[in-house]
Amino acid sequence: MTSTAPGTPEPGTDPADPRTVVVRYVDAVARGDLEAVRASFAPDATWTYPGDVPLTGVYRGRDTIVDEFLLGAGVLFAPGGAPAVTLTNVIADGGQVVAEWTSKGLAATGRVYDNACLGVFTVADGLITSVREYADTQHVERSLFGGPQPG
């Protein structure tokens, strides 16, 4: 799995730098490093996933984000079909970081999951305090939950 796109600048050397924190988090997701993923979040962090699919909601607290949202999404993939996550763009301004990534894998439904995602991260004191994730939720519904195909 690739965690940074060719040409994407490497994160800074300060481990608390917001851009570095987000790049390190996405890299941990791509590697499947659950310990590093969990350590990326503040204890009271929030993750907002808008839309009207079963994953939609506001997840409050580091453990809820990891155990219910991230691991909950993980079981929607076929055995051995865990998505490959590729970071494609990162823009940072102070404590705000916008990251784009692709996620591709085989869903438990037998359908291919291939989505472009965007997250607006807030980072403070070297930890992610909030994320607002945007993705094609119609594709999420069709591929991960077996919703009707277009056409």
Question: Which residues does each predicted region cover?
Answer:
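A solvent-exposed, acidic/Ser-Thr-rich amphipathic alpha-helical stretch
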Residues: A36, A42-A92
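A beta-strand edge to alpha-helix "cap/lid" segment located at domain peripheries
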Residues: T2-D14, L70-G151
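Hydrophobic pocket/interface hotspot
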Residues: Y25, V37-R38, A45, G61, ...
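Alpha-helix initiation/capping motif
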Residues: P11-P15, P54-V58, R62, G110
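Short, mixed-charge, low-aromatic patches
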Residues: V21-R31, T56-Y59, V75-A78, E100
